[in-house]
Design a protein with these regions (language model features):
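Signature of long, low-cysteine stretches enriched in small and polar/charged residues
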Residues: 158, 174-223
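Extracellular LysM carbohydrate-binding repeats and other cell-envelope/extracellular binding modules
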Residues: 282-310
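Primarily a LysM-type cell-wall glycan-binding module
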Residues: 248-279, 304
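Surface-exposed amphipathic alpha-helical segments
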Residues: 87, 220-256
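A Zn2+-metalloprotease active-site environment signal
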Residues: 1-95, 100-104, 108-133, 138, ...
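Residue-level recognition of short, solvent-exposed, well-ordered loop/turn junctions
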Residues: 13, 132, 265, 295, ...
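Short, surface-exposed polybasic-and-hydrophobic patches located at secondary-structure transitions
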Residues: 150-161, 257-266, 306-309
């Protein structure tokens, strides 16, 4: 509600005022606190627009309870940051160039140790596997499981690494761990790996599978929240059957993307700099703008240094 938002905003504005004071006492420009809020507001706007494009639910509310107010024009934000200007000395350090140099080569997004998402594919160097998800699906990499699900979030397939007894065949493992009768049982043999898949009847029914890779076992569970399993079962099976060891040429894909600095040349466009990014070109351009404080419609000037992800 607006009442709760207002209460929360008072607390956040107090924190912003303190942040501005800390900046001033450390020798930095205290008004940079407003720039920080602007960046966070832009991030929220971008996330909303991205959700709307993908047919996902758009989160209500606004950062700091700002509603539709832009941080640069927000009177109360200016008021809490203003007093910190009295604490600022004459040497208000910015140090943007030094900061940017420290960013060169920094990993961006997924890490090699946790696995890397690239488009509809997932790569894990240490565990030596890859698998693919249907077009339009999201991939969520959690510490305990890897999840894939469509835009409507009404179904999902999860995969996790589980302990297993090497004396059990994949079929025996699945029967032992399913805890009930299996249906539509089928052996899996893919890329030199052995596995087994079946359906666990019930409400809801579940597609389950296990794949052995060396001394590791990967358990898959696919569920449709509302409706029959058949509506997504072919897609669940496509994910399961895509699991395989990495090829040599794919090992580079299992390494994280990194930030790099590029200097804009005369005539060079954001579209050119964003080419080859994830998703559509328009999405890549929007992300590039967001990364460089140009969102939603800013353009770089020749000679500007921009952060790009490669």
């Amino acid at each position: 509600t607006a009442f709760v938002r207002g209460y929360g905003r008072d607390m956040e504005l107090e924190a912003d005022g303190l942040g501005a004071q800390y900046l001033a006492r450390a020798g930095y420009d205290p008004t940079a606190m407003i720039q920080v809020v602007r960046v966070l507001k832009n991030q929220e706007d971008f996330a909303r627009e991205e959700a709307a494009r993908n047919g996902q639910a758009v989160q209500a509310g606004g950062y700091h309870g700002l509603f539709d107010t832009h941080p640069d024009n927000d009177r109360r934000l200016q008021e809490v940051v203003g007093p910190a200007r009295q604490l600022a000395n004459g040497q208000q350090e910015v140090g943007r160039e030094v900061f940017l140099r420290h960013l060169e080569g920094m990993p961006f997004g997924d890490s090699a140790s946790a696995g890397v998402r690239r488009g509809q594919n997932f790569y894990h160097a240490e565990l030596d596997f890859t698998l693919s998800y249907p077009a339009g699906w999201k991939i969520l990499n959690q510490p305990s499981a890897l999840l894939g699900y469509p835009a409507d979030e009404q179904s999902f397939i999860g995969m996790k690494l589980v302990p297993h007894d090497s004396r059990l065949t994949p079929a025996e493992f699945l029967r032992k761990n399913a805890g009930q009768r299996l249906a539509q049982e089928e052996s899996l043999k893919q890329a030199g790996l052995n596995g087994y898949t079946a359906v666990v009847p019930g409400n809801p029914a579940r597609r389950v599978a296990v794949i052995y890779q060396g001394d590791r076992a990967y358990l898959f569970v696919g569920v449709v929240k509302v409706g029959s399993l058949e509506t997504q079962d072919d897609r669940f099976l496509s994910v399961i059957r895509s699991f395989r060891p990495l090829r040599d040429k794919e090992r580079a894909l299992a390494q994280p993307r990194r930030l790099h600095l590029v200097q804009v040349k005369a005539g060079q466009t954001l579209e050119q700099l964003a080419a080859g990014g994830e998703g559509s070109l328009s999405d890549s351009v929007a992300r590039l703008r967001l990364l460089n404080d140009l969102y939603p419609s800013g353009e770089p000037r020749p000679g500007d240094w921009l952060k790009v992800v490669r």
